[in-house]
Amino acid sequence: MANDIARAMSRLKHRDIRTRRRAVRTLFENDDPSVLDAFKPLLDDEDGWFVSKALDAYRMWGIVAGPEAVATLLQHRNLDVRRAGANLLSPLGDSGLDLSLMALDDEDGVVQRKAAKALLRFEQEDVALRLIRHANTGVRTTGVHHRALPEAQLRRALKDDHEHVREAALEVVLKEGMELNMEAFLPFLEANLQTVNILIWVAKHHPDGLAELTARLEPRHMKAVSDHL
């Protein structure tokens, strides 16, 4: 078996494409993570088939190989390769902190968002602040759900420039039962966002203000209420 693997690895650079493809198949059949490094040059191959197989190898063995293998993908010039690396950040677990922070600075929004999701496991305030202050709307939306996000930052997110971030922040505020004044809900009611959840929250925490709030409801709000009922 060891001889077969060594022979296959040496044939990955063979000039004959059929020989190279057989070598790739042999390596997969032996299912040995130690051969992963041999696939690294294939990430730059002109033939898309070899690039695809190299990515398959990293998906299979990248987590076992560790952060350095995932870093190989994240630092690649090819966008598809970097996105494949971003998909491995969450499976890396606690070993993925530094790489996930690095990936937040990638120029691609998809890589950034996948990095943000991987960072939710790290309950550190500085990580939460990196997310909530990010230029990418999707990253900020994810950051709203970070458990280490300070309450002041969460409240500030209620006034974020983007609707998705504001709505996500409101969802967390309502779920956590945080104290809010009635005026804070008005922009969301006007946009018909989280109408039912707002009414439930007010009924539970500020029942005296429920009449005032319901007086502001319009016919467009009633569909959300009726759907809930």
Q: What is the role of each PLM region?
A:
Residues R15-D16, E46-G48, R77-N78, E107-D108, ...:
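Short inter-helical turns and helix N-cap capping residues of alpha-solenoid HEAT/ARM repeat scaffolds
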Residues M1-A2, R18-D32, D37, P41, ...:
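Structural detector for internal amphipathic alpha-helices that build alpha-solenoid repeat scaffolds
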Residues M9-L12, L74, L158, T214:
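Short basic coil micro-motifs at the edges of alpha-helical modules that engage polyanionic partners
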